């Protein structure tokens, strides 16, 4: 009976690890594809914040936001639902990496709500200025998040996964 429980636990850990590996690959791929869109969003937000009456700049800001919003929504959901809970469940995973990821995620969500609350097309000049400024801050924060993920969080997750898989065979 105890052996069956251990086998079930090992299988459960393998399934969780496989989900995390898949999520990590997807997140890394999304990070690499976001570069140009982040730059476009930062520029479009800054420009429309300075010239909110320009309808072409409003359309460009809306297009820039709409190009990154769905990717970021999936990205943040994947981190929240799969990656961060898994990392939190590990005893030796650095808590500062988890805390930093959670803080950056929260900041992105707050900035995203500001941008989402306004229509770049129909909003007042004041609203568009606020949303444009938030869009630029969002893009900068997103760039910081991607940098931290690629430099710190993802390599640590890979080491933890590698340690799990090599430890499972011992």
Which functions belong to the PLM regions below?
Residues 1-170:
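Small-residue-biased structural context
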């Amino acid at each position: 009976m105890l052996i069956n429980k251990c086998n079930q636990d090992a299988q459960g850990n393998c399934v969780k690890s496989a989900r995390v590996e898949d999520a990590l690959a997807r997140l890394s791929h999304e990070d690499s594809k976001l570069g140009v869109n982040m730059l476009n969003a930062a520029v479009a937000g800054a420009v429309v914040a300075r010239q909110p009456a320009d309808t072409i700049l409003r359309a460009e800001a809306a297009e820039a936001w709409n190009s990154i919003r769905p990717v970021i929504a999936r990205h943040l959901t994947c981190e929240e639902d799969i990656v961060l809970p898994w990392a939190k469940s590990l005893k030796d995973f650095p808590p500062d990496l988890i805390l930093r990821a959670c803080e950056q995620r929260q900041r992105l969500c707050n900035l995203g709500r500001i941008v989402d609350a306004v229509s770049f097309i129909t909003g007042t000049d004041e609203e568009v200025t606020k949303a444009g400024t938030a869009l630029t801050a969002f893009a900068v924060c997103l760039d910081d998040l991607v940098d931290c993920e690629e430099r710190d969080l993802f390599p640590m997750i890979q080491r933890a996964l590698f340690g799990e898989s090599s430890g499972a065979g011992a």
